[in-house]
């Protein structure tokens, strides 16, 4: 293990992201915290709503959502990380998402 090598990961229960001002505040908060990976729970997005979550510097955003406006999770991976995604497994009800890959 190399001393000084680390990865920062944050997670947050957002209790719904259907309000534009809340999404904007969340994007600012994520940029301020500056993690490499961010996990979000309770996004309350439906599959057609996922395009609404955008954070500058974060192009890799993975969602798992149900058909109703409840549950929903997302994993955001910063553009600062050179990662290779091998597999993404999503729960159809939006309770979990698993990403397999390498950094």
Regions found by a protein language model. Name each.
Residues 1-103:
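Short phosphate/oxyanion-binding micro-motifs
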């Amino acid at each position: 293990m190399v001393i000084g090598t680390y990865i920062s990961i944050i997670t947050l229960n957002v209790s719904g992201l259907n309000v534009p001002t809340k999404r904007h505040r969340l994007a600012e908060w994520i940029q301020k915290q500056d993690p490499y990976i961010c996990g979000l729970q309770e996004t309350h997005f439906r599959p057609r709503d996922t395009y609404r979550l955008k954070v500058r510097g974060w192009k890799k955003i993975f969602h798992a959502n149900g058909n109703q406006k409840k549950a929903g999770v997302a994993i955001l991976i910063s553009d600062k990380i050179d990662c290779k995604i091998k597999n993404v497994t999503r729960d159809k009800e939006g309770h979990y998402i698993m990403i397999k890959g390498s950094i």
